Design a protein with these regions (language model features):
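Single conserved hydrophobic/aromatic residue that forms the stacking wall/gate
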Residues: 1-15
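Nucleic-acid substrate recognition interfaces
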Residues: 14-407
Length: 407
């Protein structure tokens, strides 16, 4: 009942960029016609000491606003079964800023505070559409990443001569490693701080692009693998380095050192940054590898077919947890999707209950014995074809994807 009652109406653009450059939203207007696309560039920024203080204040205020109205929504529903809409929350926040107790909210970007309310509203909408995403949680200073989003209105955000101008912050030095085309329109910026203390700005642009939808001729099926990221329908697999597994012992050793140090000491803070940098290195190595693999596939094929896997459920599995996290299937899928769409190509997801591993890709016979995951190779009892479990599954996924595209 609560899920049906707490539905809001406002939506927002949230930066989900994992890389330096990403198409985060694509809208086709028709075959061979113009395409409206959003592209996000992620640049490192170097704030001065005064700007770092302002960023810290903004992170804190955004978190406080989110938590305050999350509590407000929950209490109102418990009292009279009604919802507090985004509009009501925004009006209450405007009044709150005029009080002496909450006057500090005026010191930070007002749009960032509004975006925090929109993010809360979106979190509820996502929960109502898909309860498995989980009920919105209160944000913690320690648990959550420091970040806030702001929107470009009347030129309040600009990039010029190696500097990014942000509301209330001013000119922040920017490491711009890519040229931004003149026709790109700046839409929003998400500022974030990593656990190691680095600052980044993910800048979202909108642009018009003429993309000719490709004729689907070259199909590829991918079966995600615990050992080598995936096996494709041609029998190939990438030589995937297990970055987290390789760094696990070193991470554990440094984490033990951190746990033994006195809280609040300078040495503990130095060790905390050291551990954070190790995690960042693993993450960056994984992203680099996944970007290169997804680029090779997107350039070589017109349509890529994969299984629609439940990544969260697999991560919670006792047997699959570390493998799923280390492989980064979800991230790889995201990278592959936007790279294909940018070229007018497609990523097709096959139903997760499709029996790709049990079905013979030659004659269609279903072999129930293959439900045993330990069975890596098998011979079809009907046609006698010898199968590698993963390659056979990838071929079936490709064939099912072709059927869906041509249906």
């Amino acid at each position: 009942e609560m899920q049906r009652s707490l539905v809001g109406s406002e939506m927002c653009i949230r930066d989900r960029s994992c890389a330096c450059i990403q198409v985060s939203k694509v809208g086709f207007r028709g075959k061979g016609s113009g395409m409206v696309a959003n592209r996000a560039y992620k640049f490192r920024i170097y704030p001065n000491d005064e700007q770092k203080i302002l960023f810290a204040k903004t992170f804190g205020c955004v978190r406080m606003v989110y938590n305050h109205w999350l509590d407000r929504k929950i209490r109102q529903y418990e009292e009279n079964k009604t919802n507090v809409t985004y509009t009501i929350c925004a009006k209450e926040m405007a009044a709150m800023k005029k009080t002496e107790e909450y006057g500090f909210l005026k010191e930070v970007d007002s749009i960032a505070l509004q975006q925090s309310l929109r993010h809360l509203d979106t979190a509820f909408q996502n929960f109502f559409k898909q309860p498995k995403t989980g009920f919105p949680r209160f944000k913690s200073k320690k648990r959550n990443k420091n970040s806030y989003s702001t929107v470009c209105i009347n030129g309040n955000i600009t990039i010029s001569n190696g500097y990014l101008k942000l509301p209330k912050i001013g000119q922040v030095r920017l490491k711009q490693h890519r040229i931004i085309p003149d026709e790109y329109r700046l839409k929003s910026v998400t500022v974030s701080q990593t656990p190691s203390g680095k600052y980044y700005a993910s800048i979202l642009f909108e642009y018009e692009n003429q993309v000719q939808e490709k004729e689907m001729r070259r199909f590829l099926g991918l079966d995600f693998s615990m050992h080598e990221l995936y096996r494709d329908s041609n029998g190939k697999e990438p030589a995937y380095p297990r970055y987290y597994r390789n760094a696990e012992k070193k991470l554990a050793r440094e984490q033990r050192k951190l746990s033994k140090m006195q809280k609040g000491s300078n040495n503990r803070n130095k060790q905390r940054i050291k551990v954070a940098k190790l995690h960042e290195k693993v993450s960056n190595q994984r992203k680099d590898f996944l970007h290169k693999q997804s680029r090779q596939i997107a350039n070589a094929y017109d349509c890529v077919c994969i299984e629609d896997l439940d990544m969260k459920a697999m991560s919670r599995s006792l047997n699959f947890g570390k493998s799923v996290s280390d492989n980064g299937w979800g991230m790889f899928t995201t990278f592959l999707k936007y790279k294909l769409e940018k070229q007018g190509k497609k990523l097709v997801k096959v139903d997760r209950f499709f029996a790709s591993s049990q079905t013979c890709s030659v004659c269609g016979y279903k072999n129930a014995k293959t439900k045993n995951l330990a069975l890596r190779e098998w011979d079809c009892p009907q046609c006698g074809t010898h199968h590698d479990r993963d390659v056979n599954a990838a071929v079936n996924i490709r064939n099912e994807g072709m059927r869906l595209v041509n249906a």
